UniProtKB/Swiss-Prot annotation:
Source organism (scientific name): Sulfurimonas denitrificans (strain ATCC 33889 / DSM 1251) (Thiomicrospira denitrificans (strain ATCC 33889 / DSM 1251))
Hydrolase among keywords: yes
GO cellular component: cytoplasm; exodeoxyribonuclease VII complex
This protein's name: Exodeoxyribonuclease 7 large subunit
Record's subcellular location: Cytoplasm
The family this protein is said to belong to: Belongs to the XseA family.
Subunit structure: Heterooligomer composed of large and small subunits.
Amino acid sequence: MYTLSVSSLNEQIKALLEESFSRVLVEGELSRITFHSSGHIYFTLKDENSTIKAVIFKANAAKLKFQLQEGLKVILDGAITLYKPRGEYQINCFSISPAGHGALALAYEQLKNRLASKGYFESSRKKQLPKFPKRIALITSATGAAVADMLRVAMSRYRAIEIDIYDVLVQGDNAAPSIIRALSLADTKGYDIIVLGRGGGSIEDLWAFNEEIVADAIFSAITPIISAVGHEIDWVISDFVADLRAPTPSAAMEMCLPDEKELYQFIDSLVARYEQMISQKLYGVKQELEHISRLYQDHSIEKKISYKLEEIAQLKLSFTNSIYFKMQSFNKEVESIKIRFPNAIQSRINIVQNQVLTLQKMLESNHPRLKTKKGFAQISKDSKVIDIESLIVDEVFDLMSDRVVISAKVINKKNI
C-alpha cells in the first residue's frame, strides 16, 4: 500500500464521483441560499435526515424562470462533483425546477407578489387615458394577426386617429428586450396612448409580458399604457402594471377610441341643446330690454319736462283767469265810480287804468314761457330752475325754450 497526498486523494474521489454521478435528479428543500456578486448561486439542499451543498453557476442561473427561496421544494438536475480545496462534494446544477409546481407558474406568482408589495398595481398610480386621443403607438409584431385586427377596429371607429406601429418580437428569449427598446422609444414621442399587444398563445408564448424588466419599463413610462395580450382568459404581469388591461387587442381599440358615429350624434344633440339655451336666453334678454325701455320712458327727462310744462300751462290759465275776473270786477267798479263821479275822478281812473295795464305787461313779460318766446332760455338742473351764478365749471345743466330743451356743460365762467 502506498501513501497518497490529500490533493491526490481528492482528485481521485472527484473523478470517481463525476464518473458515477454524471447526471442526477435530486429532490429536496432549499436552505442557506447565497446570491454571489459573480452571478453564481450557492445553497444547501436538505430533507428530514441530511443535507448536501449545491451550486448553480451564472450561465445556468440566468435561465431560471423563478426566484430561489428558503424552504422551497425543488428538483435539481445536475452532476456530483468535488470541491478539491476543501474536500467537499456538491451538486453542480444544470437546471432547477419547483417540485410539484410548474416553474413558469411559480415564477409568475413570485413576481406578481413581489411587484404588488412594491406598489406596481396600485390604482392611485394609474394614469388616466384621454377621451379623444390623436396619436397612438402600437407595440406588437407587424406581421401578426393582432395588428391587423387593431387597425381594422381603429379605422371603423375613429378615422381621425394617427397610428404608428413599432415592430417587436413578441415571444422568445429576445422578446422582452425588444419590447423594452420600443416602449422606451415610443414613450419619448409624445403619444397619447401606447398599446402593448399580441394574440393568444401558451404561457411560454406570452412569457415576455411576464418578465420583470418589462413590468419595470411599463411602471416607469410617462405615457398611458394599455396591455392587450392574448385572449380574455389570459392574464400576464403587464396587465396588472399597465394603466388599463384590455381582454384582447381588438378590445383595446374599442376601449381607447371613441365611436365616430356616436360622437357625431352627441355633437348634434349638444348643438341642439345649446341652440335652445341660447334662444331662451335671447328671449329673456329681449323681455328685460323691453321692460327697461318702458321704465325709461316712464322716468325720462322728456317725460318730466312734459309734465312740468303741463303744470305751468295749468298755472298760467288759472292765473290769467284770476286776473281776468279781477279786471272785470275792477272795471265794473271803475264804471260805477265814473258814473257817480264823472268829472272829479276821471283823471284818477286813467292813472289806475295805466297802472293796471303796466302791471299786466309786467306779469306777461316776467312769465318764463313768454320770455322763451322772445329768444330767452330758462336755466334748470334736475327739472329745477336755478340761478346761472350758481353754476360751476364742468357742471351739466339744461336750457329750455318754448320748443326745445338743450343739455349744456359749463366750459368757462367769468364775472362781468
